[in-house]
Amino acid sequence: MSQPTVSASPHLPRAYLDPIDNASDALAVVHLAMQTPMVPELIGFLLDPHNRGGSIVVVGDVPEHDHDAVCRMVELLSQAAPSPDDEGAYGLVVASIRPDGWLVDGDADRWRLADGLSRLNGVDLLEWFVVGRHGATCPRLLAGDPERW
């Protein structure tokens, strides 16, 4: 079964200046941080209440079949986010780089768990991308959740 894909924007948002307002811009940031050639890794970044990003966290040497690692990353990054203030909550974008894979069984449940973990810390999980050799897709779609941009 083919999965819907997301394409990266040719526009690369500047750190701390340009808002990341859509999945294409967020995926462009993910592509910037990815290793070449592609290896199993996790990538994540927080967005301020104005959707501007800064630092990118890359976790390499992720065991290829440790699909739950993304939930641990979401939990840690959302705990590290500043508390929501008058300007609103922080957002979070994560990506699982699966060079030889795609969506796997349980990704919809992982999306729901990761979303709950981020909300416990006052952070909005905006997107989780799964990136493979054939493109990128979002487990959110499997869960039937709407886009959050």
Where are these regions (language model features)?
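Polybasic/polar functional segments that serve as interface/processing modules
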Residues: 1-149
